[in-house]
C-alpha cells in the first residue's frame, strides 16, 4: 500500500509540472490567431458530399462536423504543425498533416472510402487510449449503433447476442435474470465497464444488461480474453466496454417501436427521445436521452407461470462537455433509471398473496419474484493535452447508487454504492529503444458499500408464534430475530496501480504491462501481467499472454 501512495505522490508531482507547462501555452492560444481551415468531405466512390462527418485536430480538443452540404470550417486554430483526422462510422479514417499560421486561411478537402468491416474505427478498450482497431495489440470487436438499429435492439442485452463469441443467457424465467458469457465462461469472469470505468457492480450486473437503453450507447467494445493489464482482475473471460454517446451536432429524434411476443397477447413497447445540442463555437454541448419501456409478462405454455417477466422501465440522462481550452476538456454524464419487474404466477395479486395457496384462489403454492430498482449513475472526467502532443493526462470520478426493493418468499431491501476515482497519464515517445511507443500509467481507487436486509415483519412474527404461541416481550423478539435472515453490510476498497508500454508503428505492435490490485478483504495483493503483439499490415496475427497471481 505504501508503494501505491508513493506512486500517487510522484504522479501528482509530475502532473503539476505538465499542467504548468500546458497552461503557459494555453495563454498563447487564447489570443485569436485567425488561422482557419475549411473544406468539404465527399464519398470517394460516388463523389457525394457527406454530412455529419467528424473532423478533429489531433492532440487538441478542437473539432467540428460537416454541415448538411458536407462542408466544414475550423477557426482560430493554434499555430504549428498538426494532424487533421476525419472519421465516421462505416468509412475508413483519413488523416492529413497541416501547418497553420497566423492570419492564414487554407482549404483542405477529404475523400472517404467505405470500410465494410470497420477496421479503421477508433477503440479505447485495447490500451485505454484511442487507437485504430486494426492497429490495436488485442482484438477488439465493436457493436455500433447500426447493429442496434437493424436488429431492433432496445437494450444492451438484445444487441450483445449479435457479437460472435458472446452469449447472453436468460437464467431465470421468474425474474428475467440474465448473464453474459464470453468464451463460455460465466458472467462473473467478465468485466463490464461504462466509459472505461468499473462502476458496474455485482448487484447492477444481475439485471443491468436489460437496464441500459440502446439510445445512450455510442458503441460497445468487446475484448475476448484477458490480454490487457489496464483492467482489473475480473477481466478473465473478457471485457465489455460501453461507450456512451456525446453530442456531435444539433439534432433531435423521437421513436416508438412495438413488438409482439410469439403471436401472443404479450407486447413490448419502447419509446425513445434524443436531443443533441452543440454551441456555435463547438466549445460546449449536451446530449439528452430518454426511454420508456413497457413489456407485458409472457406465458408461453399457459401454465400460469411467466417465461418472461413484466417490465416497466424509464430512463433519462445526459452527456455534456465543456472545452476549457484548446488543450483541455471537461466531460460530465448522468442518468437515472427506474424499473419495476414482476414474474412468476398471480400477476394481478400482491406477491405475498399470489404465493400463498390459501389466499391466491388456486389452492396451490405460487412462485413469485418482484423487484423495484432506482439507479443513479454519474461521472466526471477532465482531459488535458500538451501542445507538443506528447502528454495526455486525465482525472476521473464515477459513481453509481442502487436502491432495490425485492420480494422472493419475503420482502427485502438492498442498497449499493460504487465509486471510482483515479488518474491516468500517457507519454508518447518518438523512439523508445527501437520504435515509437506510448507509455501508460495510472492509479485507481474503487469503493463498494453494499447493504442487504429483510424488511418483512409479519412473516417472521408468525413463524415465531408458530414455534411458541405463548411467547411475548423479549422472548418473542428473540424468536422473531431467530427467523429473520441476517442482514449483510459489506464494504470493499480496492487500490490499484498499473503501467503499460506499447511499441507500435503501422506494421508492428508489442505491448508489455502489469497491474496490482489491493483488495481490503484480501491479505495479499493481486498481480496481473500481460504481453501481446501484432504483426503485418494486411494480415494481422495477434498473440496475448496474461497471468494473475
Predicted regions and their residues:
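Short, acidic, small-residue-rich periplasmic hinge/interaction motif at the N-terminus
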Residues: 22-29, 34, 40-48, 53-58, ...
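Short, acidic Ser/Thr/Gly-rich low-complexity loop/linker segments typical of extracellular
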Residues: 60-71
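Short acidic/polar hinge/loop motifs at secondary-structure boundaries
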Residues: 73-76, 179-181, 197-224, 245
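Extracytoplasmic beta-strand/coil segments of soluble accessory domains associated
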Residues: 157-198, 218
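Outer-membrane beta-barrel translocator/receptor signature
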Residues: 201-203, 216-218, 229-241, 245-301, ...
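Transmembrane beta-strands of outer-membrane beta-barrel pores
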Residues: 258-262, 279-281, 292-296, 336-340, ...
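Flexible loop and strand-edge segments within Gram-negative outer membrane beta-barrel domains
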Residues: 295-315, 321-393, 399-418
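Structural signature of Gram-negative outer-membrane beta-barrels, strongest in the C-terminal barrel
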Residues: 325, 434-440, 444-448, 480-549
Amino acid at each position: 500500500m505504501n508503494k501505491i501512495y508513493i506512486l500517487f505522490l510522484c504522479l501528482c508531482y509530475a502532473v503539476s509540472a505538465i499542467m504548468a507547462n500546458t497552461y503557459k501555452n494555453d495563454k498563447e492560444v487564447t489570443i485569436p490567431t485567425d488561422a482557419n481551415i475549411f473544406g468539404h468531405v465527399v464519398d470517394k466512390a460516388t463523389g457525394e458530399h457527406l454530412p455529419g462527418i467528424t473532423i478533429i485536430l489531433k492532440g487538441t480538443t478542437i473539432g467540428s462536423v460537416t454541415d448538411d452540404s458536407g462542408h466544414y470550417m475550423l477557426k482560430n486554430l493554434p499555430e504549428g504543425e498538426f494532424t487533421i483526422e476525419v472519421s465516421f462510422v462505416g468509412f475508413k479514417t483519413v488523416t492529413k498533416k497541416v501547418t497553420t499560421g497566423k492570419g492564414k486561411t487554407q482549404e483542405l478537402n477529404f475523400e472517404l472510402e467505405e470500410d465494410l468491416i470497420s477496421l479503421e474505427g477508433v477503440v479505447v478498450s485495447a490500451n485505454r487510449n484511442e487507437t485504430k482497431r486494426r492497429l490495436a495489440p488485442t482484438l477488439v470487436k465493436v457493436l455500433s449503433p447500426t447493429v442496434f438499429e437493424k436488429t431492433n435492439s432496445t437494450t444492451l442485452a438484445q444487441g450483445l447476442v449479435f457479437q460472435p463469441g458472446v452469449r447472453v443467457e436468460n437464467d431465470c424465467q421468474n425474474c428475467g435474470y440474465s448473464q453474459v458469457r464470453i468464451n463460455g465462461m460465466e458472467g462473473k469472469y467478465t468485466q463490464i465497464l461504462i466509459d472505461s470505468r468499473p462502476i458496474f457492480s455485482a448487484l447492477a450486473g444481475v439485471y443491468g444488461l436489460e437496464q441500459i437503453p440502446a439510445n445512450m450507447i455510442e458503441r460497445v467494445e468487446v475484448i475476448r480474453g484477458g490480454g490487457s493489464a489496464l483492467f482489473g482482475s475480473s477481466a478473465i473471460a473478457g471485457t465489455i466496454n460501453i461507450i456512451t454517446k456525446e453530442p456531435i451536432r444539433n439534432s433531435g429524434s423521437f421513436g416508438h417501436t412495438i413488438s409482439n411476443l410469439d403471436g401472443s397477447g404479450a407486447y413490448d413497447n419502447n419509446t425513445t427521445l434524443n436531443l443533441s445540442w452543440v454551441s456555435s463555437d463547438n466549445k460546449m454541448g449536451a446530449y439528452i436521452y430518454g426511454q420508456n419501456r413497457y413489456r407485458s409478462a409472457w406465458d408461453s405454455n399457459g401454465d400460469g407461470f411467466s417465461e418472461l417477466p413484466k417490465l416497466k422501465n424509464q430512463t433519462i440522462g445526459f452527456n455534456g462537455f465543456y472545452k476549457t481550452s484548446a488543450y483541455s476538456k471537461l466531460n460530465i454524464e448522468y442518468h437515472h433509471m427506474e424499473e419495476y419487474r414482476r414474474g412468476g404466477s398471480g400477476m394481478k395479486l400482491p406477491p405475498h398473496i399470489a404465493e400463498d395457496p390459501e389466499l391466491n384462489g388456486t389452492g396451490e403454492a405460487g412462485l413469485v419474484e418482484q423487484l423495484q430498482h432506482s439507479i443513479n449513475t454519474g461521472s466526471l472526467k477532465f482531459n488535458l493535452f500538451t501542445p507538443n502532443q506528447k502528454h495526455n493526462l486525465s482525472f476521473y470520478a464515477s459513481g453509481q447508487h442502487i436502491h432495490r426493493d425485492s420480494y422472493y418468499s419475503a420482502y427485502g431491501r438492498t442498497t449499493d454504492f460504487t465509486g471510482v476515482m483515479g488518474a491516468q497519464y500517457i507519454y508518447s515517445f518518438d523512439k523508445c529503444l527501437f520504435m515509437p511507443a506510448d507509455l501508460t500509467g495510472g492509479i485507481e481507487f474503487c469503493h463498494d458499500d453494499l447493504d442487504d436486509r429483510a424488511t418483512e415483519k409479519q412473516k417472521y412474527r408468525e413463524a415465531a408464534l408458530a414455534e411458541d404461541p405463548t411467547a411475548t416481550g423479549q422472548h418473542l423478539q428473540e424468536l422473531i430475530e431467530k427467523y429473520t435472515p441476517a442482514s449483510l453490510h459489506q464494504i470493499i476498497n480496492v487500490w490499484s496501480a498499473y503501467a503499460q508500454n506499447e511499441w507500435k508503428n503501422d506494421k508492428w505492435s508489442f505491448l508489455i504491462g502489469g497491474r496490482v490490485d489491493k483488495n481490503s478483504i484480501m491479505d495479499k495483493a493481486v498481480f496481473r501481467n500481460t504481453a501481446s503483439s501484432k504483426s503485418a499490415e494486411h494480415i494481422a496475427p495477434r498473440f496475448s499472454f496474461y497471468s494473475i497471481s
